[in-house]
């Protein structure tokens, strides 16, 4: 008898549309892998989540939610209480990764290089620039590059107008160079991919619009640097306590003549996209792992923690 898998998707975060696409694509792959699949469009109401889980009676929950509630430990906590195994990382790892300031502190303590940065509060918004330009301003707990600003010379800073929902944001030095991402599956890296985009950086549109970005797999960097990027991705996965699949985003700064390139960890995504243009399925395919095989492995690795 095949396992029943409930796919949680949608949600009420800024990444709702992406989650709907991830959930639909994952559901199709799960059916191809032989599972009995139910789809649930989940909001931020824990009582509604409990009702949906009770009605669908899954053996495993496939969490295709992105952003707040689905990615920050809330859904994971509810499923832990219900005793229903679920894919991706557990409560603590999810909460840690979603808080960018806390995650970068864990990375630094594990010897993983991070950009210079600090947390700025709403009350600091009218002060001088928090860091030398160029710098990056990002919400502490959003994904898919939602609400990210790059502040360059002769550009207005968003801080005085404060177009953010939260009272705190993270400000980091902008790292020039190239955009890399590395997928981790269990305790091994699937490889490193370079992303190029005409948008200047890998923003929401570049991530999810067809043709918004170009992917180079494997990343065309020296073998030693490629291996180091893989090592850092696994180290970050372990520093956060992740399980299942994660994706580490890094910068590769090879812009200084006469200086060796440097790798800088930006963040780890514990709920990487599962859309047709998503990176983890692409990197898995490069290793000969089909999308149905990938989601089957994720279901087999599901647990409560």
From Swiss-Prot:
PROSITE patterns: ATP_GRASP (PS50975), DALA_DALA_LIGASE_1 (PS00843). Its EC number is 6.3.2.4. This is D-alanine--D-alanine ligase. Its main location: cytoplasm. Its cofactor is Mg(2+); Mn(2+). It comes from the Bacteria. Mg(2+) 2 binds at residues 267, 269. Pathway: Cell wall biogenesis; peptidoglycan biosynthesis. It is an enzyme of class 6 (ligase). GO terms for cellular component: cytoplasm. It catalyses: 2 D-alanine + ATP = D-alanyl-D-alanine + ADP + phosphate + H(+). It comes from Paramagnetospirillum magneticum (strain ATCC 700264 / AMB-1). The lineage of its organism: Bacteria, Pseudomonadati, Pseudomonadota, Alphaproteobacteria, Rhodospirillales. ATP binds at residues 131-181. Mg(2+) 1 binds at residues 249, 267. It is found in: Cytoplasm. Pfam families: Dala_Dala_lig_C (PF07478), Dala_Dala_lig_N (PF01820).
């Amino acid at each position: 008898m095949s396992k029943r898998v409930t796919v949680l998707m949608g949600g009420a975060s800024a990444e709702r549309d992406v989650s709907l696409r991830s959930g639909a694509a994952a559901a199709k792959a799960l059916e191809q892998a032989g599972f009995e699949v139910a789809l649930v469009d989940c909001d931020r109401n824990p009582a509604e989540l409990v009702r949906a889980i009770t009605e669908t009676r899954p053996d495993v929950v496939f969490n295709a939610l992105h952003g707040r509630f689905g990615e920050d430990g809330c859904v994971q906590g509810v499923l832990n209480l219900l005793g229903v195994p679920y894919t991706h990382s557990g409560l603590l790892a999810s909460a840690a990764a979603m808080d960018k300031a806390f995650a970068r502190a864990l990375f630094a303590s594990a010897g993983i290089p991070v950009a210079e940065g600090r947390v700025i509060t709403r009350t600091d918004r009218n002060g001088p620039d928090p860091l030398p330009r160029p710098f990056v301003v990002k919400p502490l707990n959003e994904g898919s590059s939602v609400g990210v600003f790059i502040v360059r010379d002769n550009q207005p800073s968003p801080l005085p107008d404060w177009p953010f929902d939260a009272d705190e944001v993270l400000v980091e030095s902008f790292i020039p160079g190239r955009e890399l991402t590395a997928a981790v599956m269990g305790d091994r890296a699937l490889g490193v991919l370079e992303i190029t985009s005409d948008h200047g950086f890998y923003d929401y549109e570049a991530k999810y619009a067809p043709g918004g970005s170009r992917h180079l797999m494997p990343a065309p960097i020296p073998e030693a640097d490629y291996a180091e990027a893989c090592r850092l991705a696994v180290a970050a996965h372990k520093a956060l306590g992740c399980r299942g699949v994660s994706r580490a985003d890094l910068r590769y700064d090879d812009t200084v003549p006469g200086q060796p390139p440097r790798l800088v960890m930006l963040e780890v995504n514990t709920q990487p996209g599962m859309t047709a243009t998503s990176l983890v399925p692409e990197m898995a395919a490069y290793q000969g792992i089909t999308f149905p095989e990938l989601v089957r492995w994720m279901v087999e690795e599901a647990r409560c923690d």
